[in-house]
């Protein structure tokens, strides 16, 4: 994450901290840009976060009492990156998925909630800053050199590992999330933490990050501990971070492209949302198969006409209502009236 921090420092945070916490109280005390003495204000020396590119700092990088290597500045910056950039990513890509991928006919489903899209967005807005608060200490530890992140192949285990790190990351995090997710379904935990995410029986892409914040943070822990246990290339880390967010949106978009026996895609995750106690995995079906919690999606889910048919919906509703009674007791969800759905 030091690469991301360097980029955001260069284009945003240097100017923000120079304005909020200036090294000198008055603007006229700043040295002229042409004399190159701005560095006299600070003992901090620029070192690129990666050998693949460098961004020569502007004068603003030296004009705050909180230099780039200040731990308090790093903590605040990383918190803001997680929260605000996470929010931007969520709105942009969940919206694109909602507009171009999500089948709006899903909103006619008997278990689609009243004002569901806005409720999903509201839940996400409330959750993201709290999730960011619990997450930023991991990133601070990373940028301060306590992780096993590496830059070039020569600094890592070798060329073979540059490729092996990707399946290793998927398998490790999938295993961790499986058990955390399954634990969140324990009766002593479910109603307090995981129930808010299961409010969405027929989720939209906006449900992707609509968690109780502790639930969302708990399921992200495997991602954040991985680089403290295994080596991980810095650029691969950033790419995987982006991929995780995309994947989370994709498995909530309701578009079932393929009935793959290995990949835990949108169809498998949709089964989890209406049948609750199956398909806890994030990326693959492996751990569900080994843990006895795998349920193959019905073939009808991959035929659009059948997927959206009254017969299929009725079958899902009957099963869902039975399971909700067992897991939650009374169903306190507020569903959209059928007449209203038909008029849309």
UniProtKB/Swiss-Prot annotation:
InterPro entries: Fatty_acid_hydroxylase, Sterol_Desaturase_Related. Its EC number is 1.14.19.20. It is found in: Endoplasmic reticulum membrane. Residues 167-292 form the Fatty acid hydroxylase domain. GO terms for biological process: ergosterol biosynthetic process; sterol biosynthetic process. It comes from the Eukaryota. Pathway: Steroid metabolism; ergosterol biosynthesis; ergosterol from zymosterol: step 3/5. GO terms for cellular component: endoplasmic reticulum lumen; endoplasmic reticulum membrane; membrane. The chain crosses the membrane at residues 76-96, 123-143, 160-180, 224-244. Its cofactor is Fe cation. A motif (Histidine box-3) lies at residues 269-273. It catalyses: a Delta(7)-sterol + 2 Fe(II)-[cytochrome b5] + O2 + 2 H(+) = a Delta(5),Delta(7)-sterol + 2 Fe(III)-[cytochrome b5] + 2 H2O. A motif (Histidine box-1) lies at residues 181-185. It is a multi-pass membrane protein. Coiled coil: none annotated. The histidine box domains may contain the active site and/or be involved in metal ion binding. May contribute to the regulation of ergosterol biosynthesis. PANTHER family: STEROL DESATURASE. This is Probable Delta(7)-sterol 5(6)-desaturase.
């Amino acid at each position: 994450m030091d690469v991301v921090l360097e980029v955001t420092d260069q284009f945003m945070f240097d100017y923000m901290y120079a304005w909020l916490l200036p090294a000198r109280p008055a603007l006229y005390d700043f040295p002229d840009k042409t004399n190159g003495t701005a560095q006299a204000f600070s003992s901090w020396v620029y070192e690129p976060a990666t050998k693949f590119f460098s961004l020569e700092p502007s004068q603003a990088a030296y004009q705050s009492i909180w230099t780039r290597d200040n731990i308090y500045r790093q903590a605040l910056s990383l918190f803001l990156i997680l929260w605000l950039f996470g929010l931007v990513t969520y709105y942009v890509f969940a919206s694109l998925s909602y507009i171009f991928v999500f089948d709006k006919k899903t909103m006619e489903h008997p278990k689609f909630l009243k004002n569901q899209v806005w409720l999903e967005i509201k839940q996400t807005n409330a959750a993201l800053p709290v999730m960011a608060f619990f997450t930023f200490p991991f990133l601070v530890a990373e940028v301060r050199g306590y992780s096993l992140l590496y830059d070039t192949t020569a600094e890592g285990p070798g060329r073979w590992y540059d490729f092996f790190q990707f399946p290793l990351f998927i398998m490790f995090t999938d295993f961790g999330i499986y058990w955390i997710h399954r634990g969140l379904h324990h009766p002593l935990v479910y109603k307090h933490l995981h129930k808010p995410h299961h409010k969405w029986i027929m989720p939209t892409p906006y449900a992707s990050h609509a968690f109780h914040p502790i639930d969302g943070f708990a399921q992200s822990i495997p991602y954040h501990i991985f680089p403290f246990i295994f080596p991980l290339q810095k650029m691969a880390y950033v790419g995987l971070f982006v991929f995780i967010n995309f994947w989370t949106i994709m498995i909530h978009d309701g578009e079932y492209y393929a009935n793959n026996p290995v990949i835990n895609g949108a169809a498998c995750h949709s089964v989890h949302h209406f049948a609750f106690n199956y398909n806890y995995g994030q990326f693959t079906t492996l751990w569900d198969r080994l843990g006895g919690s795998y349920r193959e999606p019905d073939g009808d889910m991959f035929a659009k006409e059948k997927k959206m048919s009254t017969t299929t919906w009725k079958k899902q509703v009957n099963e869902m209502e039975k399971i909700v009674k067992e897991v939650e007791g009374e169903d306190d969800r507020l569903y959209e009236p059928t007449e209203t759905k038909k008029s849309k």
